[in-house]
Amino acid sequence: MHLMLVLLGLAALLGTSQSQTGCYGVVNRIDTTGASCETAKPEKLNYCGVAASRMIAERDLRSMDRYKTLIKKVGQKLCVDPAVIAGIISRESHAGKALKNGWGDNGNGFGLMQVDKRSHTPVGEWNGERHLTQGTEILISMIKKIQKKFPRWTKEQQLKGGISAYNAGSGNVRSYERMDIGTTHNDYANDVVARAQYYKQHGY
């Protein structure tokens, strides 16, 4: 009896740790075609797809690891898979390497997650917890819009739709298969998901 209670307690504990980052789906369950050739070419890659996404993510890994603790903290706080946050950071700013004084996109995008000052008021330091929290909350708001728009989609499909909407807005997501048409290089969610799956394998 005592052993059963211990096992039940352990199961509850493990369940809690899983749910702390899995509220919006599990990134490894999402299908992805990876980066388009349009995304791969500026990275000087002569191939496209998941392999290209993984290579770009690998190049960003050392810079990303500086923020690993922070990314995991924000992910657990907001119940979002830290690997997804890392995937977005890689795509948006190459983990900060593409930024000038914390800004990108011709001075419109702020921080690691490139919060657009035309739509939001950026908060915190470009590489700090408040910024990552704001970026992740924007992602969550997009996921919730997709949940409302496509209630019959699986959790993972809604997560992928939310990632796509993070780039081009929920109005751009019209179907699962074509959600990335209209995003930057027409591959945003597929590329981010493939990068996130790479980061998942590296402890995010």
Curated annotation (Swiss-Prot):
The lineage of its organism: Eukaryota, Metazoa, Chordata, Craniata, Vertebrata. Its EC number is 3.2.1.17. It comes from Dromaius novaehollandiae (Emu). Disulfide bonds join C23-C79, C37-C48. One of its GO terms (cellular component) is extracellular region. Keywords: Antimicrobial, Bacteriolytic enzyme, Disulfide bond, Glycosidase, Hydrolase, Secreted, Signal. Belongs to the glycosyl hydrolase 23 family. The active site is at E92, D105. GO terms for molecular function: lysozyme activity. This is Lysozyme G.
